A protein has these predicted regions:
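Hydrophobic transmembrane alpha-helices
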Residues: 111, 126, 208-211, 390
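Small-residue hotspots
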Residues: 185, 197, 204, 410-411
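Hydrophobic/aromatic-rich transmembrane helices and adjacent perimembrane loops
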Residues: 380-395
Length: 475
């Protein structure tokens, strides 16, 4: 005799769902839809990256031979190859250390349009390294398999960082490459390869001085040899052009840069650089604009770096700029803990990795990224790509924690970060937000958040790893 499972309906009873449809068949479309939704969630980072790079190709390539990369960097590289002076006081001047021109020299051998396409591909790789490396530093799972709360963390990080991640691609600058070198160096530190990390960080410092902040940071953590290697790499890369392409008369490219541009920092009021003062979103630019006009109520006329300032005003700007800079450095050092302490172990991250000090290195690097922008003599929005790291740190903490301070900071960050895009606000209001220093306040807000996220005190877990921490607690 055939038997039916207990509590099952009779064979001849009408179906419980639609006519002619079994219960299993009714759930198949829902299951398929759930699988498709889960697939999109897991692959959302890859889809976002593909859309971003396709969308940014046109703004990057549209100016062709008139782009900033060609007019500034390739021109400097070709002058270097011809053993000419590369640091000149001219429109679209090359105002960076000579190492950047040397590294652009291979592309200077190509036609301008071809070099620009290759440079975009380099920036695509560098942007991928920045995002994936920062995500890894802060303990995120593989970006190809996002699920659960990590989907929300990723998209909140994208919302906060998108404006500043796209800015260097709009201007064809080196900032994404510098940020990639910084992230690569921090990843080496995370894995215990201190000297390798110092080499990557030194290469970044060779192209822009602000990454030199990592040298005293390494010394603070007791890595004196790594700090020396970082400074040595930065110096050697900037001296190589003098050996391979010496100028007639024995002049030094590095000396030319110091005399032409770096010396202006000492002669002028803080915030004055070879660009519009409104574009300078460093701390010195904010103080300089405030000293001239306070908070302007309209888009014009805006404060200018060419304004004749009285000696008293210049002294006031220097006092506030340098005093605030020292205060930010002191507070950051206090949050880092006592000098000489090793990195604390963070246990396993979302990948199952148990590298020592992973989250602490990521958070401390995020704080240094904010300081790099705030303490620099000149920081434009293109330089702000390094804030990808603190943006991800904030996004993860906001999603995972019930922290009232982070809840208060989020609308402030949204107002001063993503909403500064002139595509959203228009040129007049966009210029006004720059005059108010919205990006500067954005970096300050992120620095406050990172200070709050850093551990309050040294734990028993040391750089030897989680096992040592467990042994210490057992003892």
């Amino acid at each position: 005799m055939d038997s039916l499972p207990r509590n099952s309906p009779p064979r001849n009873s009408p179906p419980l769902n639609a006519p002619g449809q079994s219960p299993v068949a009714a759930t198949l479309p829902l299951a398929a839809a759930d699988r498709r939704g889960e697939w999109w969630k897991r692959r959302s980072a890859l889809v976002a990256a593909a859309v971003f790079f396709v969308a940014m190709a046109w703004p990057f390539l549209r100016r062709g031979e008139n782009s900033e990369f060609v007019v500034c960097y390739l021109r400097a590289a070709r002058r270097l190859q011809a053993r000419e002076i590369i640091h000149r006081d001219e429109p679209t001047a090359y105002a960076y250390p000579p190492a950047m021109a040397m590294l652009a020299m291979p592309l200077a051998q190509l036609p301008d349009e071809t070099a620009l396409v290759v440079w975009y591909l380099v920036n695509v790789v560098a942007t991928s390294v920045v995002v994936a490396g920062a995500w890894r530093l802060l303990g995120g799972p593989p970006l190809t398999r996002l699920q659960g709360r990590w989907v929300a963390v990723f998209w909140l990080g994208v919302l906060l960082a998108f404006r500043f991640a796209s800015a260097p691609l709009e201007n064809q600058q080196f900032d994404v490459v510098i940020a990639a070198l910084l992230v690569a160096g921090c990843l080496c530190l995370r894995r215990g390869r201190d000297l390798g990390g110092a080499v990557w960080l030194g290469a970044a410092a060779a192209m822009k001085c602000t990454p030199l902040l990592f040298a005293p940071y390494l010394a603070w953590r007791g890595r004196f040899k790594s700090a020396c290697v970082l400074a040595l790499v930065a110096m050697v890369l900037n001296r190589l052009p003098d050996f391979f392409w010496p100028q007639a008369g024995g002049l030094s490219y590095l000396g030319d840069w110091c005399g032409t541009f770096l010396a202006k920092v000492g002669r002028s009021a803080p915030g004055v650089w070879d660009s519009d003062l409104v574009l300078n979103q460093s701390l010195s630019g904010l103080v300089n604009r405030f000293a001239q006009s306070g908070l302007p109520g309209s888009a014009g006329p805006l404060p200018s770096g060419l304004a004749a300032l009285s000696p008293e005003t210049v002294a006031w700007i220097r006092c506030w700029t340098y005093g605030t800079s020292v205060a930010l450095l002191a507070l950051t050092a206090w949050r880092f803990g006592r000098p000489g302490q090793p990195w604390r172990a963070a246990g396993a991250d979302a990948r199952g990795d148990r590298d020592a000090g992973s989250s602490q290195i990521g958070l401390e690097a995020a704080a240094l990224a904010c300081l790099m922008l705030l303490l620099s003599p000149m920081s434009s929005k293109a330089h702000y790509v390094v804030l990808v790291l603190p943006c991800i740190a904030f996004a993860r903490a906001y999603i995972e924690r019930r922290d009232a301070w982070l809840r208060i900071l989020l609308p402030v960050l949204l107002l001063t970060g993503p909403l500064t895009s002139k595509g959203l606000t228009g040129k007049a209001l966009g210029d006004l937000t720059l005059a108010w220093g919205f990006p500067t306040w954005f970096a300050l807000g992120l620095l406050l958040a990172v200070w709050r996220l850093l551990p309050a005190k040294q734990t028993e877990t040391t750089a030897a790893g989680p096992l040592a921490g467990r042994v210490g607690r057992a003892a």
